[in-house]
Curated annotation (Swiss-Prot):
GO terms for molecular function: nucleic acid binding. Belongs to the UPF0102 family. It comes from the Bacteria. This is UPF0102 protein LPC_3309. InterPro entries: Restrct_endonuc-II-like, tRNA_endonuc-like_dom_sf, UPF0102_YraN-like. Pfam families: UPF0102. It comes from Legionella pneumophila (strain Corby).
Length: 118
């Protein structure tokens, strides 16, 4: 995904999630261990969200494109974020995936797409 398409997809996802009651905490958290596209709050949950845009859905949607290694990077970046901001054990967490069909911009929201045990 090009950087421009990625930003567009993230903005679509952010707007969609806000419309569905989530509040933005941080966008594009980067550390040496990995990156998190969106960090949001839903009720008491801190939700770590990976945004995927696929122009060709023949090979599966967004979740199918997330490898074990990518999940591990997201989990490590999440741990880094929680330690950095001293919030470990203060919030239940969840890993979601937003999959966007690059042709129609149809959004699919996969809650609890994976867990720290992958």
């Amino acid at each position: 995904m090009t950087q421009e398409k990625g930003k567009f997809a993230e903005q679509l996802a952010l707007n969609y999630l806000k419309e569905n009651g989530l509040a933005l905490v941080m966008q594009n958290y980067h550390c040496r261990l990995g990156e998190i596209d969106l960090i949001m709050r839903e009720g008491s949950y801190l939700v770590f969200i990976e945004v995927r845009s696929r122009s060709n859905m023949n090979f599966g949607g967004g979740l199918a494109s997330i490898t074990y290694e990518k999940k591990q990077k997201i989990i490590k970046a999440t741990s880094h974020y929680m330690i950095k901001y001293r919030i470990q054990d203060k919030f239940p967490i969840r890993f979601d995936v937003i999959s966007i069909d690059g042709k129609s911009n149809k959004i699919t929201w996969l809650k609890n797409a994976f867990d720290a045990g992958c």
